[in-house]
């Protein structure tokens, strides 16, 4: 699908052409996944850019809390952020979008999962009906399993969300604390994902996959530190949804040209290229592909293999 055009666009460094070619974004936090210019036009002012590298999720959250969240508070702000995310995906040629909606957000609709789902359906149809939107529920790892289950249960009657993801502070609590939550999600046929191996070590990746029975991992880049963990991921066909610019800006890698995605790929692990938080890191998926090409991490042909990984 569009292999020749994609390769030519990379070789010619034609970002507009790249944006026209079908791709996926499987690691996207909805509130932070939007088109920055769209939000700026709505609020009537320019939002500061993150220009310096930071070293922790806490630093990122502080930056977001100061520079962005004040403009997207409440139901109206939430819906504008979702609009911006759909607009960003459409403009970037993303035809498959797995976008993370925090399980708590039904509280913006008086606790109604049904009303939240109605809003998401409406916004999807209005702003990006051509995008295959695969809704994902997000669990903050700092919240107790008991409370997450309480927030999660009302969604189960609607069969709308297709996957779940665990994100936030990797060290907030062990994966074993969340087994019941993930068993519940699995019993409903949801795809199981989690953020792991971004700040944590390689061993934590295998442990989390085994304990929570994960299908995919968000980040997982520290797997390169263990050949046995890489073998485990390859053997079990665990896909890693990687966000290169996010990894660089959060100081998880020193240079893009040495990003571990190369070694993971060479060890037979299925990887995809994604955005994480466009509002913060300012790169769409097209820019991420071009960055990896410019930094000679992959050839254009290899990047097309990775692009197609995400579309399958």
Predicted regions and their residues:
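Conserved hydrophobic beta-strand within the GNAT/NAT acetyltransferase core sheet
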Residues: 192-194
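Metal-cofactor-binding active-site regions of metalloenzymes
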Residues: 1-190, 199-204, 211-212, 216, ...
């Amino acid at each position: 699908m569009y292999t020749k055009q994609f390769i030519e666009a990379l070789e010619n460094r034609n970002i507009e052409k790249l944006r026209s070619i079908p791709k996926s974004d499987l690691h996207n936090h909805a509130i932070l996944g939007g088109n920055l210019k769209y939000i700026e036009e709505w609020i009537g002012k320019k939002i500061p850019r993150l220009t310096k590298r930071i070293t922790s999720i806490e630093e990122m959250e502080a930056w977001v809390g100061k520079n962005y969240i004040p403009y997207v508070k409440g139901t109206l702000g939430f819906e504008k952020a979702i609009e911006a995310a759909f607009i960003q995906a459409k403009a970037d040629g993303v035809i498959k979008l797995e976008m993370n909606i925090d399980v708590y957000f039904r509280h913006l609709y008086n606790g109604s999962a049904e009303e939240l789902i109605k809003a998401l359906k409406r916004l999807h149809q209005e702003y990006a009906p051509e995008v295959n939107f695969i809704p994902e529920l997000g669990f903050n790892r700092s919240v107790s399993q008991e409370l997450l289950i309480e927030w999660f249960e009302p969604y189960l009657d609607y069969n709308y969300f297709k996957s779940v993801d665990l994100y936030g502070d990797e060290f907030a609590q062990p994966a074993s604390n969340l087994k019941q939550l993930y068993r519940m999600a699995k019993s409903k046929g949801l795809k199981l994902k989690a953020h792991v191996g971004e700040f944590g070590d390689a061993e934590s990746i295998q442990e989390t996959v085994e304990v929570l029975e994960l299908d995919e991992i968000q980040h997982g880049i520290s797997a390169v530190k263990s050949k046995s963990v890489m073998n485990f991921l390859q053997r079990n066909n665990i896909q890693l949804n990687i966000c290169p610019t996010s990894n660089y800006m959060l100081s998880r890698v020193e240079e893009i040209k040495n990003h571990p995605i190369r070694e993971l790929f060479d060890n037979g692990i299925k990887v995809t290229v994604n955005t994480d938080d466009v509002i913060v890191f300012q790169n769409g998926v097209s820019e991420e592909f071009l960055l990896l090409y410019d930094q000679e991490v992959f050839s254009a042909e290899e990047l097309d293999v990775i692009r197609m990984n995400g579309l399958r």
